[in-house]
Amino acid sequence: MTDQNRKELLHKTGELYKQFIENQDEQRAAKLAAVMKKAADEEVYIAFTGHYSAGKSSLLNCLLMENILPTSPIPTSANLVVIRNGEKRVRLHTTDGACAELEGTYQKDKVQQYCKDGEQIESVEIFDRYTEIDSGVAYIDTPGIDSTDDAHFLSAASILHQADALFYVVHYNHVHAEENVKFLRSIKESIPNVYFIVNQIDRHDETETKFGDYQAQVEEMLCNEGISREALYFTSVTEPDHPFNQMGALREELSRIEQQSKSNMQALTEQKVRNLLKEHTEMLKKDETGAPSFAEQLNIHTGLVQSLRDQLDEAEKQMTEAEKRMQEEINRILKNANLTPFEMRELAAAFLESQEPSFKTGFFFSKAKTAQERDKRRNAFFSDVAKRTEAEADWHMIDTLHKLAKVFDVYTAESEKLIQAYRTPLDISIIEHAVKHGAAFSSEYVLQYTKDLAELIRKEAKREAADIIKVLSAMVKERVSKDVQTINDRLVQESEKLVFLQEQARLENNAREKTDRLWAIWEEESACPMHIDTEWFKSKKTRVAAPEQKQGRSQLTAQPMPKSEIKMEQEMPLQDQIKRFYTLSDILGECSMLLKQTSAFRERVKRLEERKFTLALFGGFSSGKSSFANALVGERVLPSSPTPTTATINKITKPINGNLNKTANVVFKTEDDLTAEILQLTGIPKEPAGRSFTEKWEKAVKKNRLQEEHVKLISNFLLAYEKYQQYIQEQKKLTIPLSELKPYVAEETTACAVKEVTVYYTCPLTEKGITIVDTPGASSMNKRHTELAFQYIKDADAFFYMTYYQHSFSKGDRSFLRKLGLVKESLSMDKMFFIINAADLAKDKTELETVTDYVSAELVKEGVYEPQLFTVSSKEELVGKPESFYNQFSKVRKHLDRFIEVDVKKASAAQLSSEADKLCETVFQLHQSQHQSREEKEAQKQCLMLSFERTAADIEKRRNSKTIIEKVKKDTREQLYHIAQRLSYFANDLLKSAFHPGLQNGDWKKNVSKAMTTALHEYLFEYIQEIKTLDVRMSGFIERHINEEWLDHFQKTLNEDGYFSVYAGDQHSNGIQLKEVEPEIEERAFEQELKEIKSPKQFFEQKGKATFIEAVRMKLTKITEAWIKNEEESLISHYTAHLRRLQEDMGEKAIAQITDQKETYLRGYAEGEHAKEIEMAYQACISWKNSDNTIKM
């Protein structure tokens, strides 16, 4: 860079810096100053970033051959640490903008504490005469990019835009984490040199996986992302002599970078300034939030306020005009009603003629005949009048009143009943009242008569309708007055918001003017004043003394873990209790009158004794789930590896149904399953045509322009299909010895076709009836893994969530754990256990406590309160090493045993204990009745029957209760609302992440289309997971209600009554079936939004990205609302139907049980028939009750 170029650049950036400060964007002003300082000093920045706890700090210490930086398994570098060659000193930049300097000799441990203090210290610069760094070079250590602390992440991001080379460091066990690929895609285009370091390869176990195979997998992944194998290094700090350690080669590459030419410094600096300017102008326009402009919002909101005012006017008008409108409609109908048509006049004339005094008829004009004829004509005429009134008036009146009730929104069961009952009140006298006596009979008189009669009918109709109109008008006024209040309240709120938006729109316009001015400064020489100080970028920070360091080993706000400290001496002898239940059933089984009850009791005891339990393992891939499962059973049953192994659901259970120990049954997917999975993973819109599965997908590979990874994926499916076609088509199980298991669960070329593997293995754990389910990784790049795992959240009796000691609680865990947090509160008991695996890596107890405190605090952040947290070493447990301070495997086993034997079984055991007591109480009452008089027995019978009637009525009331149904409806609607809110936030974050600058690399339009497809698939997947979470929550809610209603409240009522008992059973096995949800979303729905993306420049440097994200987010929100609206009633119906089934089932069981008990009492009250049996049962119950039969909890 020439002096003249440097001077011009410094003038422009100096003016920009001034504008940034005036616009209160100190953050980007500082970045701009840092960029120009680096350019002026002609310094090379080499940054180290990657996963937190991947060993970045340890690696830097090793490269510098000195213990400079603090190291820990949890995030330690809470700020930026810059290491330079120079006179020995430390410079601290505080978060409040000051600067402190420690010159000369300093304490390393004190400096390391400053490196951990992210609250007070923003960055630390360390200078010394390091032989491993050239002058003009800075090594930069950053917090982990996947740290759960947003401040850590921002700290890392703030320096990366300045780096000349970036070394991305990952832990050996977490190479395939999805965030690796996402980060590399987002950063590789903005930094000249990107490298990938796989650290801690000392964790490699050659007996599990050959290192060459592992290396090939890593190289393939990087190659897919455009990073060459020359940029890949494998390192180990703890084992320098490790055969695969490339620390020496890494040092050589660092030396080469340090000596690289600085000829492209100006171009890189200008690009960095331009990026900062773009960010600043977006900040001015508030585009970072993706919100629409305030001018647009103002326009929309002005219309909204006017609409509310119109609604208010209309409502008030409706209140005053409802009755008038109804009356007008009724008058219109009656006016138009042809009540006395021409056809009627002949009957009218005949009737009028008969009313003449001179009217006579019959032989010799007898009076009887004349009266008979008059009645005949009167009745005929009135019948016709009544029919025509009904047809011409009543029916139309009813229809109109119905329509009016709907128009005015008062169509209720009450109003509908009132309207439907409307009839014009007609009496036969009405036709006589219209007669004008004395008038001469003529055709003109007949016409006038019919007109008068019609008017009388209309008056009657109006009078009858007036009562209905009065009721409807009152209903309208009541409803509208509520609407008016609601509209008024909203109008006040929206009017206030309108004032706010008017002010914001004004500010937004100012921001637009500022933006134009800033770009003019950068692009037009004449727009930049030339009196700017060329050393403006030099630090103007206030010099202060080094801040006081905070005391204590940790600033984490960990929650206490009381559940992990439960004393084991409280363990319950449940097996002894079960034996005692059997003893009681044997004793009472000899009493014929109690045979039905004791048989049912014995069957329930047997179900409790033989109950099966499911223990599910969750966690991110490579968290050690398979190793933990192996440690639980005591042998390497499942394969384990540093790359994701569990691509299927794997179960370990005791041998049953003739299956041999140490064998496995493999269940394959169907052709439809395979097709659906390929479509989902590749994004191919529809199933290709073809005569066979193989033909279809071979054609698809040739016809579609697929990405290389998708071609490989389909190839894997085709290989697996070809090899196991018979098993797939015929759905036959494949039985194999354990020695042949690995390909079916760990190699995608086979495992992709496997649905489930059941391993039969005899050990103490499986003999207790426990089945271990090892699920796919919760944060694996393969979405199929997590989708398969989710169903076990609901079904498992208990589950363990695994996290890795040196990489605990990464961002990949967050979404899954947040759903566990949502589910946890709905469970009737806490069945979640959290495991920190590989705790043998702990240096000492202090470090271990730091990690457990950190994990506990992070779990609490995600809604998992009071987590049951343990640290283990599956590796050491498997080889039989004695338990140490870090390996709590024996405690895990004890807690698991207690949970299964006490927490899970205690509800059933308590019910059985209560039922046993009630059986004894029945015997005691029957025994007492044997010594009562006939009168006393009769009185006892009457009390029994009254109690039976009360209890049966109570059961019916509970069975038909609507209260819980309304609660279910309310809770479902409320949860769906929150799901929509969460998905809106998720969409915003997802789209910002999906549409990154890396898309400019290659075919822009193709990359954008792919990004959209991927984002839509992820959004769809998140929606489905949210609905599944809702299913689990509602299942727990319903189960808890049934338990409270039938086990607690009803049982208490029965105990107070004294005659009857009801065994409700275990509701967990009756859980709700997860609802299948298959919403559809297509990329073509967003064609218009994609068309608006003109070019990378327009998208990233102008307002394109923010506008696009907001447009897509809003459309996704509407689509989601439509999904939810479509699902809402279906879900409510699904849940309420399940609840009604449970209530009905409970009611039937209860009625049957109390009926049996009533019959037993009645037989016992019979004179002397069962006296001997009752006496024997009585003595046996006395003996049983006197022994200790209490369940110890």
UniProtKB/Swiss-Prot annotation:
Q: Does the keyword Ubl conjugation apply?
A: no
Looking at the record, which segments are called D2, does not associate with membranes?
A: 561-1193
Which residue stretches belong to region D1, associates with and fuses membranes, tethers lipsomes? 1-609
Q: PANTHER family given for it?
A: SARCALUMENIN (PTHR10465:SF0), TRANSMEMBRANE GTPASE FZO1 (PTHR10465)
Name recorded for this polypeptide: Dynamin-like protein A
Q: Name one GO biological process term.
A: cell septum assembly
Task: Show the domain comment.
Answer: Has 2 similar domains, D1 (approximately residues 1-600) and D2 (approximately residues 601-1193). D1 is able to bind membranes, tether liposomes and cause membrane fusion in the absence of D2; both regions are required for GTPase activity. Possibly the fusion of 2 dynamin-like genes. D1 alone promotes membrane tethering but requires D2 for stable tethering and content mixing.
Annotated region (G2 motif D2), positions in chain: 645-647
What organism does the UniProt record list as the source? Bacillus subtilis (strain 168)
Where in or outside the cell is it found? Cell membrane
The further comment given in this record reads: Strain PSB025 / 25152 does not have the SP-beta prophage.
A single GO molecular function, which one?
GTPase activity
InterPro entries, alphabetically?
Answer: Dynamin_N, Mitofusin_fam, P-loop_NTPase
Annotated region (G1 motif D1), positions in chain: 50-57
A GO CC term assigned to this protein in UniProt: plasma membrane
Region entry G1 motif D2, spans: 619-626
Question: Which catalysed reactions does the entry list for this protein?
Answer: GTP + H2O = GDP + phosphate + H(+)
